[in-house]
């Protein structure tokens, strides 16, 4: 376990994480949070071989610098929560991690000492998407870009010793202080940056309205680049563009009167830019000139251009309209006439931006003299746009074919569903018929069983009658035999009578057993009928 005040080593990391893999370049994620027993204060060369590391967690430690991780070019997530990073110099090496997407510096002294550290990190790491568990928004990127680009311009101009005394008075320290005042009120929650910057702009609005900014610098490109050295008002304008739009009418009225100052400065001497008021910082006061180009299909033309149609420039433009190379035929689409046709969106809406682009190019070409270079440029542009239109039309045809295939598949599915439904109906009908036949068979068997029972009863009754009749006839025969037999045969009669009495007893027993058997069968039949 590491001790407070001692750096860690690669062997310590292996023992800490029980890492037995030889090639440390295969490690993608590493978590080394601090504990009460020991905290990391210096990394040293312990992460030298973790070259493919993408996630690193060093939270709850005592790091005073981030040296030792600048070689991790593939690092995407870095957690430095609750460490001892006190200044921007301590985190300066983070700008080498250009693939970094998530960074956490909360509860570090640098967060309180340098409130504009977010702008620095957003400007230094372009791919940063989340800082201190909050997303990096486009407004912060714009503010960082304006702030640090102006700082670079001021530094380069200071080295050339071109600024005058009033330029040195407004140094980068004042701008940094202004940014600090704004960023102090900037909350990390969504949507609070507008309120904070609006509050800052209201506090400094009265003081700025009384000041006049005058900055002169050499410009090799153009005297109209009014945003080379933006101030705090420019950053506020980025966040509060809606407020600027409300007052655009008042600013546009005052702008033409000041455009002559720019022209006079451009003619008098070297190129220079002069900011007279915050209005000119936000809106350019250069007047633009344009030439109206009428569409060949239009029937209505402005009254101010009716007398110019006979000029050679207009004749050349009309001739160019007839050229199929410069103006190829556009695709048209015919739709079915329906009652709700007005509610449907028209096809080919993609033609509008292309037509606007063509009109802009025509205006650009008509303002200058005719030369072969502009003509060939316009021809190439038209050819490219026609190719784009063909590609889009091909895409629409493909969509139509896909729609037709979808309709066919839907129709086929409907047919299959109908067939399946008919088969189900047939099967249900057959099942119902089978149930009815089973019911009929059950009724028939029940009736047959009832008939069998009735016949059994009749048979038993008939057997009873027969037995009774036989039992009645036996004594009469005995009496007749006694009268007819002579006396000498009395002994023999007695013997025969005894034999007959024994046979009658056996016969009676057999009849009784038969009756009992029939009764048992009858009971079994009745029980079977009751169970069914």
Swiss-Prot record:
Subcellular location: Cytoplasm, Cytoskeleton, Microtubule organizing center, Centrosome
GO cellular component: centrosome; cytoplasm
Pfam families named in the record: LRR_9
Coarse class of the protein's main subcellular location: cytoplasm
Residue ranges the record marks as coiled coil: 385-532
Gene Ontology terms: biological process: gamma-tubulin complex localization; spindle organization
LRR repeats: 52-73, 74-95
Keywords: Coiled coil, Cytoplasm, Cytoskeleton, Leucine-rich repeat, Repeat
Annotated LRRCT domain residues: 108-147
Region (Disordered): 247-268
Keyword Ligase: no
Presence of keyword Aminoacyl-tRNA synthetase: no
Function: Involved in the recruitment of key centrosomal proteins to the centrosome. Provides centrosomal microtubule-nucleation activity on the gamma-tubulin ring complexes (gamma-TuRCs) and has critical roles in forming a focused bipolar spindle, which is needed for proper tension generation between sister chromatids. Involved in centriole duplication.
Family: Belongs to the CEP72 family.
Name this protein carries in UniProt: Centrosomal protein of 72 kDa
Gene behind the chain: cep72
